[in-house]
Amino acid sequence: MNSADFDIPFSSQSTEDWKNRVTKELKGKSFSDFLEWRSVDGFKIDSWQDSTDNAPIDLPPLKSPWKLLHPVYNEDAVTANAEALNALMNGAESIWFDKGFLGAAEILAHKDIDTSVAPVFTRSSSIFDVFQEFLKNDVEPDLTQADKNGLINGLRLRERGASIVQEVAYSISQGISLLNSGAKNENIYFNTGIGTSYLAEIAKTRALRLLWSNVLRVSGDTEENPRLIGINLSIDYPQADEYNNILRATTSALSGILGGVEFMMIEPWNRQWSDELQFSSRISRNIQNLIRDEGRLEKNLNAADGSYFLDQLTQQIAKEA
């Protein structure tokens, strides 16, 4: 076969040419009704994107895979420790104690957990104590630094009805306040609620990364990704057809991971109405095990990069925040 047979000229088509052709095919129906994506948060984006109006986003690259954060709700220190150790032996890479333990109970809860390998967090009403920074051998924590280590709790805001843009705006402003008070970037954690609006949540997480890297650049620090802890928004999970919540949790996990969180936690789908969490906790943990071991997303750290659609949505959220 002659190579000349492949020399078929193709004329370039502009975005406007494409839209005109589509409008013709729609036979009078509205282009925007069919081919503009609208999110529940009010974002409107053309479903067809190219490089014409999309400059690449300068996001700091992710350097390591996310860590599977397993929640422990038991209020007994010994039982909580046993659950944590079991989770770490079955795929978990970090632990979240929903109850804070003090004194001897704290020692029991953290027994045999190497916090240099598996970070341990505890929930608090006002501060996120990062125990892997404190629990080093028998050294007492420097309590004078406690107010310089904290959590920006965007999750709580989302649970109370805040929009994606409101969460981002609040989180960044609180982060700036912590920096101004003397906190170091590596000690600031952003707890972000991950809902089920798949693309919007990916873009929201990337918008947090984009804005925080800009904050660090302006303040003279090295541009880095924020320390993001993604937690699925399980507060709205219905009890009816409860196993459908597994799909909702999977969507949230993928959004957080593709968006670039450092830690991802999936709460049990029946957390809001049941105390029997052993089975649902295992399933929630295995959602991320499957994403990691079968989806292999830990091998592609920046999978969302290069998407014109996600880049434009990321910029919209960042601009409105």
Predicted regions located by residue number:
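Glycine-rich and small/hydrophobic secondary-structure elements
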Residues: 173-180, 243-261, 283-292
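Short, well-ordered amphipathic alpha-helices
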Residues: 176-180, 206-217
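Active-site or pore-adjacent capping/gating segments
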Residues: 251, 262-321
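Catalytic alpha/beta active-site cores
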Residues: 1-201, 219-229, 257, 263-267, ...
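Short, solvent-exposed amphipathic alpha-helical segments in soluble enzyme
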Residues: 84-89, 207-210, 281-282
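Conserved, mostly hydrophobic/aromatic
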Residues: 42, 91, 212, 259, ...
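Anaerobic metallocofactor- and corrinoid-dependent redox/one-carbon enzyme cores
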Residues: 150-156, 163, 230-238, 243-249, ...
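Short glycine/threonine-rich loop-to-helix capping motif typified by GTGT followed
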Residues: 196-207, 234-247, 275-284, 309-321
